[in-house]
Amino acid sequence: LCPLDVLQLSSELLDIDGNEVEASRILSDITAFGGIRCPLTVVQSRGIGTIISSPYRFIAEGHPLSLKDMDGWFRVSDDEFNNYK
């Protein structure tokens, strides 16, 4: 999806109910869209997932972050070849 190396958020991230988004469990080695293998997937505590996407390779404090809800997961790749971690 989106090649990201670092994700830093200075304040808490809230879901649509105003609750803090938390990574409560990790699912290992699943297949994503188009048969791409995702060795690490983090699921929100309430089971509502998001995909984090950005035009920036590194997201740091001060950069805009746009979240798009899609199919219950978010994935972060570690390089331009979309090797997910």
Swiss-Prot record:
Signal peptide feature range: none
Molecular function as annotated in GO: antioxidant activity; serine-type endopeptidase inhibitor activity
Post-translational modification: The N-terminus is blocked.
Domain of life: Eukaryota
Thermal dependence of function as given in the entry: Stable for 7 days at room temperature and for 30 days at 4 degrees Celsius. Remains active after incubation at 100 degrees Celsius for 3 hours.
This protein's UniProt keywords: Antimicrobial, Antioxidant, Fungicide, Protease inhibitor, Serine protease inhibitor
SUPFAM superfamilies per the UniProt record, alphabetical: STI-like
Biological process according to GO: defense response to fungus; killing of cells of another organism
Family: Belongs to the protease inhibitor I3 (leguminous Kunitz-type inhibitor) family.
Function: Inhibition of trypsin. Has anticarcinogenic activity, prevents transformation of DMBA-treated JB6 cells. Has antipromoter activity, prevents promotion by tetradecanoyl phorbal acetate (TPA) in JB6 cells. Prevents tertiary butyl hydroperoxide-induced mutagenesis. Protects AT base pairs and shows antimutagenesis activity in TA102 and TA104 S.typhimurium mutagenesis tests. Inhibits paw edema formation induced by phospholipase A2 in Swiss Wistar mice. Prevents the release of arachidonate, the parent compound for the synthesis of prostaglandins and prostacyclins.
Name this polypeptide is given: Turmerin
